[in-house]
Amino acid sequence: PSADAQGRGIVVAGDTASPAVGTLARALAEHLDWPLLAEPTSQARGGPQALTRYAELLATGPGRDLVAQADHLIVVGHPSLSRSVTALLGREDLDITVLTERAGWTDVPGRARRVIPVDGLGARMTDDAASRATRLADSLTLVRADAAWAEAWRRAVADLPEPERPGSTDAVANAAVEVVWEAARPVGAPILLVGSSMTVRRLDRLA
């Protein structure tokens, strides 16, 4: 990372059964103005910081250039859907913090600088996610990024070539995934159960 990258970081949110954990990941990304790479089952995939097609972006030259400008990485939940995210978690040039609500956490390469139990953050039941995110960021001396940081990630995603849709059957399947995802997003909507690894990867790519 460059010398001026102190306030630049990335939040990765993987699978979790806890809505509070997903909400905290999203709140951290919004508080710090960092890009949010959130898997569909992270319960964090929403808001202005969440990026679509992030796994594709990380595998491109512009994506690698953006990662090289980052200084911090926060990992929440259990990310496991893409090789490009796994490679990101294994980088030696990032200060990596893992937030975990379970006994086992994702740090396969052993690169995490610190592991913090989410339930050990000293939060009161009356706290909202924004308050918890603020206290956590302060405790880790994390600095809010300049607005250009997140915007650079959004532009890079927007500049990705349109995904190939090789046949009508594939196009129909993609459209169906998008419709189901949108129907499951509102508060109070029925729980969406995704039944196979290929299905959730398609959802991760399209939704």
Residue spans for each PLM region:
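Generic structural signal for well-ordered, non-membrane alpha-helical segments
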Residues: 17-25, 63, 78-82, 142, ...
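Glycine-rich, anion-gripping cofactor-binding loops and their flanking helix/strand elements
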Residues: 13-109, 206-207
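Terminal amphipathic helices with adjacent charged low-complexity linkers/tails
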Residues: 96-147
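Active-site diphosphate/adenylate-binding microenvironment
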Residues: 152-207
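Conformationally flexible catalytic loops at phosphate/diphosphate-handling active centers
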Residues: 1-5
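Structural motif
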Residues: 8-10, 72, 191
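A structural signal for short coil/turn segments at secondary-structure junctions
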Residues: 6, 32, 92, 184-188
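Extended, charge-rich low-complexity interaction segments
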Residues: 63-83, 129-164
